[in-house]
């Protein structure tokens, strides 16, 4: 191999320690991951636009270009991060039946800046004892629209869920597809283990530089320069899944922890930039944006989920005003006006 046994052992130990240090698995609960109940009689109605601090959420269909244009008001997004429904996760009351049609309709209307990045979280579907590559047609279509299939990441969700899974290993990951038309350098958000140190030298002053093809040790290209404080994340996103029990604590699907969109927002946007979320759901990306100083422009077709997103935001940021754009009235005032009681 060109390495001594001691050098190989040193490299393996360092790699193992780095993986442990860089893992973003979190054992503590995040209060922001708590989701309010879905209301039987929602306050929100189709066409409503809620101003939520620096963010906007419209109750409307992201496949409708007029809805997206109204929401964006001429603004362009630096990032689209979303987790679309798949595998009959959500009941759209027969508004959209075909998944490809849904995805093409939504992604044809992306209000992106020229260097905008599009990251989409999807999971596996098994039917008749096979993995169904349901995304294939949509991936091909994205390419015809000028969106490069730039990268493919893995979201490591932590330990597998209990169950026998019909003979399969316990699921513990999902995918994040990355599209763009222009590359944008990812932000360096991962702390470096040896920050500030000149780690290319051992204690005795000898070098740990890689050997060349002929077996000789090459020079360190950054000799005399300390290791940087942070680095670009790797392609495995290590974040624990939402801890709620689907069907018990959570009565709507595709709930992911706030830490996931927070990671993506911090990786591919700067504070103050716009993020487009076409499937707002329970408002997870809104919370991540508030936490990181980004501005979300979101659509959600179902009025009850709009209410959930608003209430969830309010329970985490009660000091941030939430008003109906058309009237300037607060969410509570609109609830009394429409339902006769506070929401």
Question: Residue spans of the language-model regions?
Answer:
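Core catalytic lobe of class I
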Residues: 1-307
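S-adenosyl-L-methionine
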Residues: 46-71, 310-343
